[in-house]
Amino acid sequence: MSPRAGQTRSAGQTRSAGERSLVGLAALLALFLALPVAVLVGRAVLDGSLGASLGSETVLAALGLSLATTAVSLTVTVAIGLPLAIVLVRRRFPGKWLLEAIIDLPIVLPPSVAGLALLLVFGRRGLLGEPLDILGISIPFTTIAVVIAQVFVSAPFFIRSARAGIAAVDADLEDAARVDGASEGQVFRTITVPLASGALAAGLVMSWARALGEFGATIMFAGNLEGRTQTLPLVVYAEFQGGDLDASIAAAAILVLAAFGVLVAVRVFRWGRALDVRASA
């Protein structure tokens, strides 16, 4: 065997050992992430608490409130976040970096801090609380407060993903459409959104999942009022604090299954789009 062949074989063995190590580490990480969730859902299913919780008025009310508020918060997030993402990508202006940092700030803020900050703005003695109180408007500890808390903590996830998707769209394609007489709305609907749809969908899922699981800001700003501000994560906490571990596990399992179902649906949607693109190529 020549020295060069020996070196090649040795390098191949080293690379193979390194790859096996990486695969092993990846498997350990996957197990670390999946095992607690699997045990949670498995226990809820096997002991029957999941089925029982679906007949609980408290759980059903919290689930309905969670779905309703996250639908509203996601609508608000898209209505505000998508135009903002376009401006941040396509425009240059002084202080842009500061605005981007402010938008991303809720991602790293502890949720309880976010809730306290919202209370200092919208609370009865807050910055806007007194003027709103004069108008007869009270926001804290209402369903509106739940939506505001969800938008505050979840919008940055959508905006960040939308910015990445829009930045990947070739601006020359948009300019070409304008030259051909397309309006800004037509360019947006026929060029920007379709080409950035993957990133937009990912942002929607991340934002919705964050809103669905929101706890800290909600309990600080909106409270834990059954039928009014008690979302499903708050039921998990309330049942655990009350000593009903089975009910807490069941409510948590519903959250896991709902979030996982949406993630799977989006994966299937993106897989289907990829197949369509390949078929048309």
Where is each model-derived feature located?
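Short, Lys/Arg-rich, polar N-terminal cytosolic tail immediately upstream
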Residues: M1-A17
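Membrane-interface capping segments at transmembrane-helix boundaries
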Residues: R4, T8, R267-R278
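Membrane-water interface segments at the C-terminal ends of transmembrane alpha-helices
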Residues: S16-G48, E57-A167, I191, L195-G216, ...
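Glycine/proline-centered hinge or cleavage motifs at structural transition points of membrane proteins
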Residues: D180-A182, P194
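Glycine-rich helix-loop "coupling/hinge" segments at transmembrane-helix boundaries
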Residues: L120, A217-G243
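Short coil/turn motifs that cap or connect alpha-helices
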Residues: P94, D172, A182-E184
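The alpha-helix within a helix-turn-helix
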Residues: A177
